[in-house]
Amino acid sequence: MLGKKTSPKALPKRRGFILYQGPSMLDGAPIVVIATLSTSNVKTGDAIQTWILRDDMNPVEATKTGDDSSICGSCPHRHFNNGACYVNVGQAPNQIWKSYKRGLYEQYDHKLHADYFRSRVVRLGAYGDPAAVPFEVFHIIARLARAHTGYTHQANHKNFDKRYFTLCQVSADSPKQATKYQKQGAKTFRVAMEGDGLLPGEIECLSDSDGIQCVDCKLCDGVSQNIAIAVHGSRSSKFNTAIIARG
């Protein structure tokens, strides 16, 4: 019938896709990147989550042996360093790795699967640091998606690809660090202790101040805004201790 609108064809249901299998850009060890299409994460909202994992070992084991450096690099908050990382590696990362080993995720094919990303917000690195992944992998996905968010702790790593300044906020653990990275041209995401003020040009994370989800905010894209957030998570006291120890 003339003038009748047709709904777009629904995409076949998928759990997720393997975006990359290959060497870590940080140390050359084998890693895998998996995008999962559904989430229950209340803070981010309905974003595609990407998980950066060791290919050859369970993520729980990797955190115990220190081999998580392939995906977390020099992040001071790694569990191996008794740090303040809020990710419970035994939950989602572990389950996703097990599902991957059971063959439950398809290899991403741009011609077949691009539409799964086009109308979505993508979170680069729900676990693991995006800088462990070849820049081109996430650059393609970020350009395809409606929007993206991402964070890296690797700005000082010897193998850091500075093109990630255009995709990710640089994580900062102090006002001094934030100022340093901003002078290098990065947008920062600073974790602040309770009572800290904002630096010039910073705004408070809108999830904290206004309850806005990441899918609606979309400012943590590496180019929009410097952000600060109060330290959070069950291991936050370890962050406080580390910051106090460093002065």
Residue ranges and their predicted role:
Residues 1-247:
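Class I S-adenosyl-L-methionine
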